[in-house]
Structure formats: structure tokens, C-alpha cells
């Protein structure tokens, strides 16, 4: 089930996952998590470092890639 809110976040997270880009995820309480995005769905992101953590999206404030990422939301939505 896709909605307008996911037309941007899904292609972005998918590009980070496919390209194995290390990310820093900041939670709303200020905690910083680091690792690679293993998978994601409508509600959670699986973040892999030494262990795999399930992080609920409602707890995420910011996702910061370690390097620039090229992603095209329009191309992903069309496929």
C-alpha cells in the first residue's frame, strides 16, 4: 500500500539500501544510530551494524547518508 508520503521516502531509502550507503539515523529523543539500511516497510527500518536493529519510523527524526546519493523519485514511482 503506497501513499503520497512514501513517494519520496521509499525511493530514498531504497537507494541507500541498494548502494549500501552507511547512514546516521537520528531519533526524536536525540540518539544517533549508525549502520546500513538492510530493509524497510511502511512502519520500520532494519538498520544493520554489528547487529540488526528494528527502528520504528515514528521515532526517526533524520536520516543522514555518509555520502551523496542519486535517487529519482519519479522513476521509482513509475516502475
UniProtKB/Swiss-Prot annotation:
Statement: the UniProt record of this protein carries the keyword Phosphoprotein: no
GO-annotated cellular components: cytosol
Start and end residues of each Sm domain: 10-69
Record SUPFAM superfamilies: Sm-like ribonucleoproteins (SSF50182)
Family annotation (PROSITE patterns): SM
Disulfide bonds: none
One GO BP: regulation of DNA-templated transcription
GO molecular function list: RNA binding
Keywords of the record: RNA-binding, Stress response
InterPro entries: Hfq (IPR005001), LSM_dom_sf (IPR010920), Sm (IPR047575)
NCBIfam families: Hfq (TIGR02383), PRK00395.1 (NF001602)
Subunit structure: Homohexamer.
Main function: RNA chaperone that binds small regulatory RNA (sRNAs) and mRNAs to facilitate mRNA translational regulation in response to envelope stress, environmental stress and changes in metabolite concentrations. Also binds with high specificity to tRNAs.
Similarity comment: family membership: Belongs to the Hfq family.
Name of this protein: RNA-binding protein Hfq
Lineage, opening ranks: Bacteria, Pseudomonadati, Pseudomonadota, Betaproteobacteria, Burkholderiales
Amino acid at each position: 500500500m503506497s501513499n503520497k508520503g512514501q513517494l519520496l521516502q521509499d525511493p530514498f531509502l531504497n537507494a541507500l539500501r541498494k548502494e549500501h550507503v552507511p547512514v546516521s539515523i537520528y531519533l526524536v529523543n536525540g540518539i544517533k544510530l549508525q549502520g546500513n539500511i538492510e530493509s524497510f516497510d511502511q512502519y520500520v527500518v532494519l538498520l544493520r551494524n554489528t547487529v540488526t536493529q528494528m527502528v520504528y519510523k515514528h521515532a526517526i527524526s533524520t536520516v543522514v547518508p555518509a555520502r551523496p546519493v542519486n535517487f529519482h523519485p519519479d522513476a521509482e514511482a513509475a516502475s
